[in-house]
Amino acid sequence: MNVLVINAGSSSLKYQFLNVDTREVYAKGNCERIGIDGSFVGHEENGGPKQKLEVALPDHRTAIKHVFEILKAVDAPIDGIGHRVVQGGWYFPESALVTDETLGWVREVAPLAPLHNYAEADVIEICRDMFAQIGNVIVPDTAFHYHMPEHAWRYALPRDVVDTYHVRKYGAHGTSHRFIWRTVHELRGDKTHRLVSCHLGSGASLCAIEDGKCMDTTMGLTPLDGLIMGTRCGTIDPSTVVYLNRVGGYSIDQIDTMMNKESGLLAVSGRSSDSRDIEEGAHVGDEHCQMALEMFYYRTAQLFAEMASSMQGVDTMAFTAGIGENSAEMRQGVADRLAWMGVHLDAQKNAVRSDEPRVISTPDSAITCMVVPTNEEYMIALDVAELLG
Ligand code: AMP
């Protein structure tokens, strides 16, 4: 089955066209600057060179038309479309076929993720209307966390506030964490009942997974919570918002921008949100970069222990996403701060670069540590195949 996976943002639209059975990626790309001057499509076919096609993309409808036009060059029919949805709210315990009802849900919960859900809902509607013969599936990033125990998702706020505004932990990166569990389980079977999946990219979250079920995760109502990220501050005292507003004179919108776009590794290092630049700075003695790394290791190890505690133990730790898959130094930094839990990496194995899932801990490590490249598009395509198959 051939599936087109779409990941729409407010001014961008990423796509990947792949075969679920062979995992072959026929083509992938992204439409950038939709609705803004200078829009273009970056497109790659069968691992070939990336082409930049400068086209006017006044809206998402035009972008989708372009994507379908470009994909005509691929000699394979589109059998289904999978839509990544950032926030499924209290509605989606799993992926679902697009209907008037499910599309309505995506819009209803959009105030929780306004930058993403509105655009995603529009794109889903456009695809459904333009290509009525192709099945469309909604794959919410929160669905995997839906069944977290109540003691993990409930916020200790007044019940009527929680109920009226649906303020609770929803988590994010669920599709990636689900893929990591699936892969680790395929490789390790019953040796892993309790996994902490560590998705460390420009956005970062940990997820405690026991026998395939999410027990807790570090992101909360929104993807701002938890770990220190590229430009996001992660968990801080919530009163900071009130204080900055009342005493600092910052508006709520300014604080929102500050905490999401101007904080995290970027703010602490004063150099970059990219871990490669920060590692480089730290190596040449930049103290701010050294502190950014130290804080990243400290918080990641601390929250790892929190995730382990939610399962009363942990068998396997899996690193994934941009930092988790590529930075041996960051993996080592986190693992060093977990030596008290019996985590020990094999330095040689940790240094290996590969696209394959692999073990990087020593045989006597109390927790098996792995690197597992994530593949959210494939996971989405699998859901499409299951629901349409
Ligand atoms: P992601 O959001 O998963 O695409 O991850 C993006 C982040 O991963 C970048 O901002 C970098 O900090 C980090 N990253 C990507 N590639 C590498 C690499 N080769 N070495 C170290 N860090 C990397």
Per-region residue spans from a language model:
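Short glycine-rich, Thr/Ser-proximal phosphate-binding strand/loop in the N-terminal lobe
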Residues: 3, 12-56
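Glycine-rich beta-strand-to-loop/alpha-helix junction loops that act as flexible
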Residues: 8-9, 84-88, 200-202, 314-326
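Phosphate/pyrophosphate-binding loops at sites that engage ATP/ADP/AMP, CoA/4′-phosphopantetheine
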Residues: 67-79, 186-189, 304-315
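Short beta-strand-loop/turn "lid" adjacent to the catalytic site in phosphate-handling enzymes
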Residues: 71-116, 135-137, 143-152
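Glycine-rich phosphate-binding loop of actin/hexokinase-like ATP-binding domains
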Residues: 144-247
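Catalytic phosphate/nucleotide-handling subdomain of diverse soluble enzymes
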Residues: 210, 216-251, 257, 321-352, ...
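A mobile "lid/hinge" subdomain adjacent to the ATP/sugar-phosphate binding pocket shared
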Residues: 248-292
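Internal helix-turn-beta structural module
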Residues: 290, 294-315, 324-389
